[in-house]
Amino acid sequence: MPRYAQLVMGPAGSGKSTYCSTMVQHCEALNRSVQVVNLDPAAEHFNYPVMADIRELIEVDDVMEDESLRFGPNGGLVFCMEYFANNFDWLENCLGHVEDDYILFDCPGQIELYTHLPVMKQLVQQLEQWEFRVCGVFLVDSQFMVESFKFISGILAALSAMVSLEIPQVNIMTKMDLLSKKAKKEIEKFLDPDMYSLIDDSTGDLRSQKFKKLTKAVCGLVDDYSMVRFLPYDQSDEESMNIVLQHIDFAIQYGEDLEFKEPREHEEESSSMFDEYFQERQNE
């Protein structure tokens, strides 16, 4: 039977560890067993238990302190991830061979790992050899995405990971619970955007004709092929988390091969209502 994996990606500070923590709690409430693997060798702390931690294999601080290497923070991280890619047997031993595994991989935030280096692609290929169905989950801070220019930048970051890894990908705006009501109204247009209206918003202040043409080309590409769409993620709202989980499950076909399991005693049936996030907030 297949196993399932989410590669949780996104820039530093986008909420990857918080996403893993809240998603694990949400899945536990649904009687689903989900484990987390930390793949960030520079992580300092996280508030969830992990089944494997790359820092047990190699840690950035140790690499930076090695006089024979003389790496800085970014070089140290790249060295750690390349070392990890050469030692996938360590990860295999940590994961074991349990069927129906559902694992969240908390990945580093440096974009060069997805655009310039083969490490993450090699990880995906290795997981697929271990019979994992893999979905990329790309996070972007919603507070960063409230302007057209920044939104287009976020689209390009998400596209770079999507093109590099060649796996199903769900793009998420995190920290929706931190936005004001006014900001939520503003950001709603970016969840399923009209790219041609964004072109007008983005190019109005541009003096360079080259940048105007580039912006129009990017927006046209995204709109013509429907390549990027963002889902809102509000950790204080169960319905928002349900919608995100449903999209990911659909991408990796979770549940199609699972055997039926009786719910635990005194456990209420989970709601199957997956209304859109903003529908109930229109009157707020």
Curated annotation (Swiss-Prot):
Pfam families on file: ATP_bind_1
Keyword Nucleotide-binding: yes
GO-annotated molecular function: GTP binding; hydrolase activity
Site (Stabilizes the phosphate intermediate): 74
Gene Ontology cellular component terms for the protein in this record: protein-containing complex
Residues spanned by motif Gly-Pro-Asn (GPN)-loop: 72-74
Superkingdom to which the source organism belongs: Eukaryota
Residues annotated for GTP binding in this entry: 13-18, 174-177
Region of interest (Disordered), residue spans: 262-284
Keywords on record: GTP-binding, Hydrolase, Nucleotide-binding
Database matches in InterPro entries: Gpn, Gpn3, P-loop_NTPase
Protein purpose: Small GTPase required for proper localization of RNA polymerase II (RNAPII). May act at an RNAP assembly step prior to nuclear import.
Subunit structure: Heterodimer with GPN1. Binds to RNA polymerase II (RNAPII). Interacts directly with subunits RPB4 and RPB7 and the CTD of RPB1.
Family: Belongs to the GPN-loop GTPase family.
Listed name of the protein: GPN-loop GTPase 3
Chain's gene name: Gpn3
